[in-house]
Amino acid sequence: MLGRELRLRWRMCALRLLAISLGILLCTHFSAELRRRSGPPEKLVVAKVESTARDLNKRAEEMPSRRQVIYVRRSSSSSKAANPATNRRDNNKPIRWHIDLQPWASSSHSLDSEAIRFLRYITTTQIICSHRIKNGQTDQSVDASKPWTVCLDEKFNLAHQIRNKQCRVYSLGLGEDDNNFEVNMASRGCEVHRFDPSIASTQIHEGERLWHHRLSIDWRDPKPAIATHKLHITTKKLGTILNEFGHWKIDVLKADMESAEWKILENLILEGVVEQIGQLIFEIHLHWPGFEVSGNDSSVVRYWYSLFKELERKDFKLFYTYKDLSKPQRFLKKEIYNASSCYILSWVNTRWT
């Protein structure tokens, strides 16, 4: 009896020890699991968040800006041409919303000071051109009413482009009958596009190299809500037309826009289109401020001057200036400063060499 009782007690003790050992083992396992889950997960979560943030930032840097304006199709090649005349515009540049106004000519902000500075600027050439041709003609004895003048000095790109039959001319006008410049430039081998909203057909192909388009160049595109067929004429920005035509550059841009030239020139500067132009020939009108140019007389003249200084910053140099004495001699509706109401100015982009 005593032996049996001892064996039962031993078995009970063994079972208790086994239960205690099993409990200790389970507690140790659960404790280790809890430590593993409570420590590293925070690091894992933080690492994952940081990795996600880096991915998002990388994607944001790689995505093009929503505000970027693209007017020309992108080249499939990433390399840039050595000649500035064939370089594409940098579409990653930030958009400019206004030009940089020049400091006032004097502390008094007077019209006299602004007008004297401006008139001196437009009547003083900045670079010498030894080989100028007017209206596309070599014969300088021809008396042209409007001397649209280009520079064919060898140091500039236009002479080479004409020789290689690769030059392109854009002519902007409003019902102008005289197209001698366009015809003569086409006969020299240039591809000439004349934009005039007054022509009868949508497009007229004259000869081998001259196209007439029933389009009016504006400083803004028409609102999308306005249907095209409701417009009497089609108006577009020059950058939009470049994109639609697939043109990367313009060797010569001639413009006679009857006081719309100021806002058009501003648009070309702000959107970088002017950098794709080799030579500019503009007829400017000074008898009134121009379309959508506001402010008092001093502010208007300061704005005009600032536009031309913007061109100068882009390395455009004035090589020809013409004062039209056949037009009224008025400056902002006044007969002052011995100024004409109309001048023709020619610039060359000295980056195109």
UniProtKB/Swiss-Prot annotation:
Keyword tags: Methyltransferase, Secreted, Signal, Transferase
Protein localization: Secreted
Entry GO MF terms: methyltransferase activity
Residue ranges with Polar residues bias: 74-86
Disordered, as annotated region: 73-92
Methyltransferase in keyword set: yes
Main location: secreted
InterPro entries per record: Methyltranfer_dom, METTL24
EC number assigned by the record: 2.1.1.-
Pfam family of the protein (one): Methyltransf_22
Lineage: superkingdom: Eukaryota
Any one GO CC term of the record: extracellular region
Keyword Transcription annotated: no
Signal sequence annotation: 1-27
GO BP term, example: methylation
Functional description taken from the UniProt entry: Probable methyltransferase.
Record-stated family: Belongs to the methyltransferase superfamily.
Protein name: Probable methyltransferase-like protein 24
Originating organism: Xenopus tropicalis (Western clawed frog)
Lineage: Eukaryota, Metazoa, Chordata, Craniata, Vertebrata
